[in-house]
């Protein structure tokens, strides 16, 4: 129970950090540069999570030193915040969570955020089960998940550039189509010693990770200056809903229909 409580508390803190970061960032950029700004931000975020994932193979998760290192990293991140002289964005007098705000500003963005959450959470949480059922070894499962995150990190800025150059709605549509083809292609993969399973994981991450960035940029295109915090919180709320539901459905489908059911669900 103590572990569950701490996990809930850490989730609340992380959600708060993302809300502040994204609302501040969205308030400081223009519609012409919003996609690239979100792409750069998400590249740093995704690449850092990849490094953290790889550190699991170096550090012992159950050891005290691992948590000390994490605490030091969190403390170090406070330095640029405390030293900055940039004025914070405008906020409403009494900000609150308003999921309807995101729906009113851009229903497409809400749909995109849900798709990004479902695909990402299902792969990250249920991907190890999928890897084990198709015959991957423990270290291969780690590389399998890392290929997914690495593909997502590399896609962020190029897709952000496309979202600034072309209509963000069409970028979202083509990303979704590419994600569907990537999911369908992944159905036939098996651990036959080839690189195909890792290439497909890379491609799946490349097509699904940037959906959130483009969707968030599209929603903020229509937001007023005093709505940034509430809109960012609302988008993260929908992301959390998708991230909670996806692993539950994906794990159940895998149990009934086999490992390929995860990609069928995402498609």
Where on the chain are the PLM-derived regions?
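A membrane-interface helix-boundary motif in multi-pass transporters
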Residues: 58-73, 252-267
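Helix-loop boundary and gating motifs at the non-cytosolic
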Residues: 109-112, 121-130, 134, 141
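Cytoplasmic helix-loop-helix junction between adjacent transmembrane helices
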Residues: 10-43
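Structural signature of the two symmetry-related core transmembrane helices
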Residues: 71, 170-185
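Intracellular juxtamembrane helix-capping segments at the cytosolic ends
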Residues: 16-29, 209-223
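Loop-to-transmembrane helix entry/capping segments in MFS-fold secondary transporters
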Residues: 31-41, 138, 223-235
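C-terminal membrane-cytosol helix-exit motif in multi-pass small-molecule transporters
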Residues: 71-91
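Helix-to-loop junctions at the C-terminal end of transmembrane segments
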Residues: 60, 155-167, 254
């Amino acid at each position: 129970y103590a572990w569950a409580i701490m996990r809930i508390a850490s989730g609340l803190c992380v959600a708060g950090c993302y809300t502040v970061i994204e609302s501040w960032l969205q308030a400081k950029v223009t519609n012409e540069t919003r996609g690239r700004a979100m792409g750069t931000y998400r590249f740093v975020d995704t690449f850092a999570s990849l490094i953290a994932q790889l550190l699991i193979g170096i550090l012992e998760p159950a050891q005290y030193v691992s948590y000390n290192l994490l605490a030091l990293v969190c403390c170090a991140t406070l330095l640029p915040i405390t030293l900055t002289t940039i004025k914070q964005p405008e906020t409403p007098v009494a900000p609150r969570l308003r999921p309807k705000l995101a729906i009113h500003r851009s229903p497409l963005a809400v749909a995109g955020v849900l798709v990004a959450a479902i695909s990402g959470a299902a792969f990250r949480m249920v991907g190890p089960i999928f890897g084990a059922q198709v015959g991957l070894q423990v270290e291969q499962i780690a590389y399998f998940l890392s290929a997914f995150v690495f593909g997502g990190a590399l896609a962020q800025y190029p897709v952000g550039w496309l979202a600034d150059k072309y209509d963000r709605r069409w970028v979202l549509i083509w990303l979704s189509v590419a994600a569907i083809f990537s999911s369908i292609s992944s159905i036939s993969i098996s651990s036959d010693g080839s690189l195909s399973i890792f290439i497909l994981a890379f491609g799946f991450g490349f097509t699904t990770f940037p959906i959130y960035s483009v969707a968030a940029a599209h929603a903020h295109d229509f937001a007023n200056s005093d709505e940034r915090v509430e809109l960012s919180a609302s988008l993260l709320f929908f992301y959390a809903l998708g991230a909670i539901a996806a692993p539950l459905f994906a794990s159940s489908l895998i149990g009934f229909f086999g490992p390929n059911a995860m990609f069928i669900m995402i498609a």
